[in-house]
Amino acid sequence: MADEDLLKGVRRLEWARTHMGLLREVRRKLKKERVFEGLRVGMALHVEAKTGILALTIREAGAKVRLASCNPLSTDDSVSLALKEEFGLEVFARKWESREEYYGNLNSVLDLEPDFLIDDGGDLIFLVHTERKELLDSVKGANEETTTGIIRLRAMASSGDLMFPVISINDAHMKYLFDNRYGTGQSTMDGIMTSTNLLIAGKRFVVAGYGWCGRGIAMRARGMGAHVIVTEVDAVRAVEAKMDGFQVMPMMEAAGNADFIVSATGCKDVFTSEHIDAVKDGCILANAGHFDNEISKDALVKASKGIEKVREFVDRYDLSNGKSVYLLGEGRLINLVAGQGHPVEIMDMSFSLQALALRYLSQNHQSLENRVYDVAREIDEEVANMKLETLGVRIDKLTESQRRYLTDWTSGT
């Protein structure tokens, strides 16, 4: 069985490497520049094939790397095994980790005494600032992958508690326009369909949150024939959802007729005790946000007279009011708990940003303040141009006359 899992993991890594042409070019550049030689890099990301290729890329460019999962349920055990046994990478991760295992594995990564961190959700960075403060002198900076982590880190920076510079990969154009929208949209639907084997067409499909992730989910659900309803707390995004052709209403109203409710907000208590009495019997609840607090499991447990696992990633909550609801993947990231995460080509772009931003950090950390920075525009454009090249797409360039026009305020009617 172990041999089968090892072969499965190796094949998944090879498939990912084959289809990650951008990262292959980035690896070539980094090996030539030798900028990572002697560095120690601690990583907390979803441990699956695409992440494995990023970790191997950074190691092949000269760094010593340790990798843990950023979510207790998102590890692909076959890939984790292959990274350790076939490629000799130091990996501390397994699927279905307990809370103690999860934080123990993060601490194992930090035992490397890393120079730089690559995080997803902010737990690794948070740990350095709380239980592992002795590392604040050695950690020179970090990259953060996702919306939820950036929300936490901006709060830390605004309160003066962030003690090293962090680059927000999430806010790069080549990340959120593609990873958050197309990646989350496709992979969330994949996770829902894999876990339930139910039809999407004709169903009432509620998407909580109309940020880039919510946009992607709503777009894909509509494309599969669902009647999509959006819930929001932001008036601007609500107007946008309405103009995009979706119904918009409060969650209390939407829950009563929902066949599916998917949360993608980055905030807690999106679906909680006040919604349980209103929810439609048989409704399926799923989370596409990083943490498992968007759908309140405590509220579901308190309102239930019984809980039963009915499929591998599906728990039925029999409510005291006589209704039942189904929670997918224990309320954690459904696209990684039940699916394989974002498409390979999407993560090729995001992880190329990660590697190039790490290069930028390693070369510029001494001049950076302890706050959250956007990815440098030249890095965003470098990845975009590489992607166009792999797609065989050519675009126009501004002429010198056009450049002068765009910078000349005297030009008018």
Spell out what each predicted region is.
Residues 63-76, 229-231:
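Short internal beta-strands
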Residues 45-62, 179, 183-258, 263-268:
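Glycine-rich phosphate/diphosphate-binding loop of Rossmann-like nucleotide-binding domains
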